[in-house]
Design a protein with these regions (language model features):
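Hydrophobic transmembrane alpha-helices
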Residues: 1-54
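Small-residue packing motifs within transmembrane alpha-helices
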Residues: 9-13, 55, 73-76, 145
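Small-polar-interrupted transmembrane alpha-helices in polytopic inner-membrane proteins
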Residues: 19, 56-64
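Membrane-embedded alpha-helical hairpins and interfacial helices in multi-pass inner-membrane proteins
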Residues: 28-33, 61-79, 83-175
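Membrane-helix interface "capping/anchor" motifs
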Residues: 46-56, 93-101
Length: 175
């Protein structure tokens, strides 16, 4: 029992670390209104097991410490990711087809996580922090930019996780 706990924690720590490294390695592109966070492709791992939820969410929290928005990004980014992945995991109880799960995961990210991040960036970035009535135009532009990059990295995530699953059974990694 103890060996399995150590194994699970080690794997989760490695996944969180990979997320952080992939984010920080391309830091200028990982944060802000126009971002391309390749580490988000790891979010497709929850399709295989709910045990991937914690390391991905933890990776987001740690990576966002280095964001220009700091603790604000830690809060909103972790909230958005954690919520989107948790709802995906819940929906997966009713959906067994892996490709359908991947698509559902993308859709839930786009409608749950990305609006939270777009709101955060609209309110707390640069000159926008002084704008008290919420600027819907800014939000829409930021949301559109995030949407496009998120779809791209999540599709990359499908390709990577499906290829990886052929080599390593991603459902059984934690066993």
């Amino acid at each position: 029992m103890r060996n399995n706990t150590v194994k699970v924690l080690t794997i989760q720590a490695l996944i969180a670390a990979i997320y952080v490294v992939l984010t920080i390695a391309i830091a200028p592109f990982s944060y802000g209104a126009i971002q391309f966070r390749i580490s988000e492709s790891l979010s497709q791992l929850v399709v295989f097991s709910k045990k991937y939820w914690f390391p991905i969410t933890l990776g987001v929290a740690i990576a966002n410490i280095f964001s220009p928005l700091g603790i604000v990004d830690v809060f909103f980014g972790t909230l958005g990711t954690g919520l989107a992945l948790a709802i995906s995991i819940f929906v997966f109880k009713f959906v067994k087809n892996r490709i359908a799960r991947h698509i559902i995961n993308i859709i839930l990210y786009l409608v749950i996580c990305m609006p939270i991040i777009a709101y955060e960036i609209t309110i707390f970035s640069g000159d926008n922090s002084a704008r008290v009535p919420f600027e819907f135009g800014s939000f829409t532009a930021i949301y559109g930019s995030l949407l496009l990059s998120q779809v791209i990295v999540m599709v990359i995530g499908i390709i990577i996780t499906e290829a990886l699953n052929k080599a390593i059974d991603l459902k059984k990694v934690f066993e």
